[in-house]
Amino acid sequence: MEGLTSEQMVAFQEAFLLFDKNGDGCITLEELAAVTRSLGLEPTDQELNDMMREVDTDGNGIIDFQEFLSLIARKMKDGDGDEELKEAFEVLDKDQNGFISPTELRTVMTNLGEKMTDEEVEQMIREADTDGDGQVNYDEFVIMMKNAERKISG
């Protein structure tokens, strides 16, 4: 999507991959059910179907990455994105120390099939790192994502 930084795309892709269990680039109803249940939620079949219909804008029965991005932008715009932001941060913060380090970012990018130089990783961190400590804390992540939401929604 236009206006997204590399960091924002990484965060969204990582979240998408959590849902896309078989790695085919699409989220099926079954994958949506599995992930929501793994988060401790127990949606009914009707609730799952409603969620799928809300996101699956082209009606083909699966959620692709663009539809997923649209959902995230909508959720953030609706003001209920705080929980989603927290979850996305936790996905990227592999060691759960409250920071996204260059090593964690490199690991995520590698898992997404992106080979990055140390300089590219450092640049991504620098763009979001407002306090200059060399890593991204949750507050910096929230600012970065809110800025992305404004760019997405215009």
Curated annotation (Swiss-Prot):
* Pfam (any one): EF-hand_7
Please give the residue positions where the record annotates the modification N6,N6,N6-trimethyllysine: K115
A single GO molecular-function term is: enzyme regulator activity
Q: Is Metal-binding a UniProt keyword of this protein? A: yes
Tell me the PROSITE patterns matching this sequence: EF_HAND_1, EF_HAND_2
- Give Gene Ontology CC terms: cytoplasm
| Sorted UniProt keywords | Calcium, Metal-binding, Methylation, Repeat
Xref: Gene3D superfamilies: EF-hand (1.10.238.10)
Please name the SMART domains in this protein's record.
EFh
Fetch the InterPro entries from UniProt: CALM/Myosin/TropC-like, EF-hand-dom_pair, EF_Hand_1_Ca_BS, EF_hand_dom
| Domain of life, per lineage | Eukaryota
Locate the residues binding Ca(2+) 3.
D93, D95, N97, E104
Q: List residues of the EF-hand domain.
A: 7-42, 43-78, 80-115, 116-151
Tell me which residues bind Ca(2+) 1.
D20, N22, D24, C26, E31
Q: Which residues bind Ca(2+) 2?
A: D56, D58, N60, E67
Q: What does the entry list as the binding residues for Ca(2+) 4? A: D129, D131, D133, Q135, E140
Q: Does the keyword Membrane apply?
A: no
Chain's role = Potential calcium sensor.
- Please state which protein family the record places this protein in: Belongs to the calmodulin family.
User: Know the name of this protein?
Assistant: Calmodulin-like protein 4
Q: Which gene encodes it?
A: CML4
